[in-house]
Amino acid sequence: MVTIVDTLSNTPLRPRHPEKANRPDSISPAKPSWIRVKAPTTRGYADTRNIVRENGLVTVCEEAGCPNIGECWDKKHATFMIMGDTCTRACAFCNVKTGLPAALDAGEPEHVAEATFKLGLAHVVVTSVDRDDLADGGAAHIAATIRAIRATCPTTTIEVLTPDFLRKDGALEQVVAAKPDVFNHNLETVPSRYLSVRPGARYFHSIRLLQRVKEIDPTIFTKSGIMVGLGEQRHEVLQVMDDLRSAEVDFLTIGQYLQPTKKHHAVMAYVTPEEFSNYETVAYTKGFLMVSASPLTRSSHHAGEDFAKLKAARDALAR
């Protein structure tokens, strides 16, 4: 379980989630056997961690407490989280720090590009915190990062996982103009759970955001994901699939929600591997080019391999 308070040399710092500090604990059921993963101990993991530290970068792998960090970092795969480590939203599921972020680091795009080169990444995933404090939500910074990676690693394919740019006119267009290979924006949960899980966002705004990407540039792959185990019903998950297909989204990910701390939203259910397999089958019948659904599926897990499959699926349709 990840601590709610950041520490440095045993000295307590500010609460990681001050808005949650006084909430009563939410108790989740014990994790089933299919959820458990091994602690990261490999040389590849250590090498990736060193490259991240040397370039002064933040990864969502660490900040969000991803269960797949050992596997991904062993393969020198990492998802870079730009625009700082502090988010202006306070979603009930997320372990990223909340509060007032620091100013943007103008050198960050080049640092990310350099780390991408050092890791030898064929496919890189770049995500970010929400930056509601910025006029464009950080869109120009995301676009600059895409361009920096292109300049340094011209053969590397680029996937961005973006905020919703709520009430940020023109922001989405800046990111799309930089031409990422994959534009990912997660819905996170079904509409009925938004007020308790993702109160700062709007479900249909997120659907429209994904739809707009395809309208601006149909060649960009679009991707979205949800977590299950937050109290949703099966029919609601199927409706999300239909909504995403109506926006021409290509790739769907579905994973199990895991509670970061007892101050976060409780796990309401652990969805079985068989249920995930069924969701995957149904999603393919609805027309998604690529579907990843399993207890440990996360947005950037196996992103490189999945991009190759996604491209092959579209090429097959074109023939």
From Swiss-Prot:
It catalyses: [[Fe-S] cluster scaffold protein carrying a second [4Fe-4S](2+) cluster] + N(6)-octanoyl-L-lysyl-[protein] + 2 oxidized [2Fe-2S]-[ferredoxin] + 2 S-adenosyl-L-methionine + 4 H(+) = [[Fe-S] cluster scaffold protein] + N(6)-[(R)-dihydrolipoyl]-L-lysyl-[protein] + 4 Fe(3+) + 2 hydrogen sulfide + 2 5'-deoxyadenosine + 2 L-methionine + 2 reduced [2Fe-2S]-[ferredoxin]. PANTHER family: LIPOYL SYNTHASE, LIPOYL SYNTHASE, MITOCHONDRIAL. Keywords: 4Fe-4S, Cytoplasm, Iron, Iron-sulfur, Metal-binding, S-adenosyl-L-methionine, Transferase. Its EC number is 2.8.1.8. One of its GO terms (molecular function) is metal ion binding. Residues 1-12 have a biased composition (Polar residues). Its cofactor is [4Fe-4S] cluster. It is found in: Cytoplasm. This is Lipoyl synthase. InterPro entries: Aldolase_TIM, Elp3/MiaA/NifB-like_rSAM, Lipoyl_synth, rSAM. [4Fe-4S] cluster 2 binds at C87, C91, C94. GO terms for cellular component: cytoplasm. It comes from Bradyrhizobium sp. (strain BTAi1 / ATCC BAA-1182). Its main location: cytoplasm. Pfam families: Radical_SAM. It is an enzyme of class 2 (transferase).
